[in-house]
């Protein structure tokens, strides 16, 4: 039983580290000269990881692609909130987290996460599950970008049944929502947790197909918008909207809570936060402006893959 558990951890880890390498290479190609700087970290008797951070790039103002593999004798509260019956189990967890904060306000911020947990007591049959997804946070909306993003996500999901995309799309809309602002963080994507409804091999295959689809979903958007002209107004709005990103990650994000409760490397956990941000109390967009359109047409629940988008 223990060998089977370790085999699962090893298999998932090999894929996630390879995905980390591919993602970093792809973004470095977009940058030209800037490179991710790698930091290896260890937690005594608790695992470790490799953090890769790119800062002050031409295209990417700050971006992180992190891999971690941690273990312990008790799951942090953030991981057992929905399953208190496993709160006393020892565990192993692996994950890849990506957040890219582009410099150009017309390029959306993007987030992706793929994770695997396995927990058990003694040699009992371990419980395992996958979680993750990806979501997009534009500052200025383009219909074609949103449709492309969601159509790639749907294509990846449809290999596992037509009900998967609507289910995980709805879960993403629900999760990435700022209740105190009464608004979504962005235009969504896919989100899932506790995925173990299929056998391990099929669940893992889903993770791999989703992970492999990420660059197809995001890179064309970055490539099409990274040279879009912008001025001080657009930059200020980007910094203002980044405040919502900070609020969500510090108030609601379960991955952030898990990492901090576990006692992981703080710098790696908080790499999701943008390098520059502003808050403007009581600010409202000018009616009819591009900024107003973001709220009216994009920060709403929509069926992005339909012809009408209604």
From Swiss-Prot:
Role of this protein: Involved in the heme biosynthesis. Catalyzes the aerobic oxidative decarboxylation of propionate groups of rings A and B of coproporphyrinogen-III to yield the vinyl groups in protoporphyrinogen-IX.
Chain positions recorded as a divalent metal cation binding sites: 101, 111, 150, 180
Cofactor: a divalent metal cation
Binding site for substrate: 97, 113-115, 263-265
Gene designation: hemF
Catalytic activity: coproporphyrinogen III + O2 + 2 H(+) = protoporphyrinogen IX + 2 CO2 + 2 H2O
Protein name listed in UniProt: Oxygen-dependent coproporphyrinogen-III oxidase
Active-site residues annotated for this sequence: 111 (proton donor)
Location(s), subcellular: Cytoplasm
GO biological process: protoporphyrinogen IX biosynthetic process
Highest taxon of the lineage: Bacteria
Species: Coxiella burnetii (strain Dugway 5J108-111)
Region Important for dimerization, residue ranges: 245-280
EC number(s) on file: 1.3.3.3
Site entry (Important for dimerization), positions: 180
Keywords on record: Cytoplasm, Heme biosynthesis, Metal-binding, Oxidoreductase, Porphyrin biosynthesis
Pathway assignment: Porphyrin-containing compound metabolism; protoporphyrin-IX biosynthesis; protoporphyrinogen-IX from coproporphyrinogen-III (O2 route): step 1/1
UniProt enzyme class: oxidoreductase
Statement: the UniProt record of this protein carries the keyword Nucleus: no
Family recorded in the similarity comment: Belongs to the aerobic coproporphyrinogen-III oxidase family.
Subunit structure and binding partners: Homodimer.
One of the record's GO cellular component terms: cytoplasm
GO molecular function annotations of the record: coproporphyrinogen oxidase activity; metal ion binding; protein homodimerization activity
InterPro entries: Coprogen_oxidase_aer, Coprogen_oxidase_aer_sf, Coprogen_oxidase_CS
Classification via Pfam families: Coprogen_oxidas
């Amino acid at each position: 039983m223990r060998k089977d558990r370790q085999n699962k951890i090893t298999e998932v880890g090999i894929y996630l580290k390879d995905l980390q390498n591919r993602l970093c290479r792809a973004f470095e190609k977009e940058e030209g000269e800037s490179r991710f700087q790698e930091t290896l970290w260890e937690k005594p008797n608790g695992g470790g990881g490799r953090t890769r951070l790119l800062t002050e790039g031409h295209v990417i103002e700050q971006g992180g692609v992190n891999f971690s593999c941690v273990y312990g004798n008790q799951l942090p509260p953030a991981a057992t909130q929905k399953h208190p019956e496993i709160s006393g189990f020892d565990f192993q967890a692996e994950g890849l987290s990506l957040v890219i904060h582009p410099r150009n306000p017309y390029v959306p911020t993007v987030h992706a996460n793929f994770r695997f947990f396995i927990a058990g007591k003694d040699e009992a049959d371990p419980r395992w599950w996958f979680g993750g997804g990806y979501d997009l946070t534009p500052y200025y909306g383009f219909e074609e970008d949103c449709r492309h993003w969601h159509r790639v996500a749907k294509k990846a999901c449809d290999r596992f049944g037509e009900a998967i995309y609507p289910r995980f799309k709805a879960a993403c809309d629900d999760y990435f929502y700022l209740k105190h602002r009464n608004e979504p963080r962005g235009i969504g994507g896919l989100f899932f947790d506790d995925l173990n409804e299929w056998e391990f091999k099929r669940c893992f295959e889903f993770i791999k197909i989703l992970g492999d689809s990420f660059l197809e979903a995001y890179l064309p958007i970055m490539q099409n918008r990274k040279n879009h002209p912008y001025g001080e107004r657009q930059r200020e709005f980007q910094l203002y909207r980044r405040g919502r990103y900070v609020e969500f990650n510090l108030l609601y994000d379960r991955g952030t809570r898990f990492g901090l409760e576990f006692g992981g490397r703080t710098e790696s956990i908080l790499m999701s936060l943008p390098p520059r941000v502003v808050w403007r109390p009581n600010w409202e967009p000018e009616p009819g402006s591009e900024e107003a359109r973001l709220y009216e047409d994009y920060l709403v629940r929509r069926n992005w893959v339909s012809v009408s988008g209604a």
